[in-house]
Amino acid sequence: PELERYMLHRLHTVLGDVRGHFDAYHFHKGYRALYEFCGTELSNFYFDARKDVLYCDAADSELRTACISVLVQIFRGLVTHLAPLMPFTTDEAWRERYGDEACVHMEVFQNVPGAEVDAAQWQNLLALRDRVNMELEKLRAAGGIGANTEAEVVIDADLPVELVREVCGVSHVSKGEALQVAKHGGHKCPRCWRYYGKLEQSGICLRCDEAVATTKAA
């Protein structure tokens, strides 16, 4: 998936920068780079965009599996690079993940191969996300919506609408002449909280219906 490729690209870049800082004995700069990556790009962006997939997709869905694979690489990369700075915390995290016999301080720095991404598209996409978030905040302040999932968005950019929907956390995105945000006029799925034009007979959306059926079959 495009979002996972982008996060692997960013992880590869950040970890490379951190090792460069460590090699120059600028440990405070390495820590700062990791701190900003965790706060801005993981917590405020990737985790926010993908929590819906982790919570609501079928356990074996391709998208959820890809997301978990990226999370594993993020964990290994962050913990090994934080180990010189936070030896006890990273040791505890590593043993919790891999068992009491494992020791992060016996590991080398974990890196990931760089993934090719369309840099111009991502620059435009992140700029659009900022614009959408500003409009969503205005709508929220006016009492129009609560969560972003209550909104639908019309974009004025030539970008993949599903990718825009994912990174903005809204229920529907379409293309138009100008950027517009509004409360979605459809039905709320009580399982994933996204809005749709119609729900299934089970009272939930098609995606959730299929995920529940898969869980019951297992």
Language-model segments: which ranges?
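Short cysteine-rich clusters marking metal-coordination/redox-active sites
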Residues: 189-192, 205-208
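Hydrophobic residues within the alpha-helices of tandem HEAT/HEAT-like
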Residues: 38-39
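Processing junctions and N-termini across compartments
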Residues: 183-186, 198-202
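Acidic, turn-prone loop/beta-hairpin segments
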Residues: 1-20, 47-142, 146-152, 178-180, ...
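A broadly conserved sequence feature marking short terminus-proximal activation segments
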Residues: 140-187
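Short helix-adjacent coil turns
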Residues: 22-29
